Amino acid sequence: KKNMLLVNPIVGIGGLFVGAPMLTANLGISSYAAKKVIDDINTGSAVATIIALVTAVVGGGLITAGIVATTKSLIKKYGAKYSAAW
């Protein structure tokens, strides 16, 4: 849970969302924390999309918007477990 306090603001506000394996490798968080990030996107997908788009407009977050959209489509198509593994 301690890792999630650091990851959620970075992912949500900073627009640095990447796939779960990249989260674990780049940010040094557990697989559990990465799965929680995927769950947060799945639960609040509209909010995540809005944040990603605003970040894209503000500067440089276009990749983030694409990754969030990809994650959302993977969740719909294959489920949250596959998306977390991606």
Curated annotation (Swiss-Prot):
Alphabetical list of InterPro entries matching this protein: Bacteriocin_AS48 (IPR009086), Circ_bacteriocin (IPR020038)
Superkingdom in the source lineage:
Bacteria
Query: Pfam families from the xrefs?
Result: Bacteriocin_IId
The alphabetical list of record keywords is: Antibiotic, Antimicrobial, Bacteriocin, Secreted
Q: From the Swiss-Prot or TrEMBL record, state where the protein is found.
A: Secreted
UniProt crosslink position (Cyclopeptide (Leu-Trp)): 23-86
The Gene Ontology biological process annotation of the record reads: defense response to bacterium; killing of cells of another organism
The protein's name: Bacteriocin thailandicin
Q: Name one GO cellular component term.
A: extracellular region
Its biological purpose is as follows: Cyclopeptide antibiotic with bacteriolytic activity against the Gram-positive bacteria S.aureus and S.thermophilus, and lower activity against the Gram-negative bacteria E.coli and P.aeruginosa.
- Which species does the entry assign this protein to? Enterococcus thailandicus
The UniProt entry lists the main location of this chain as secreted
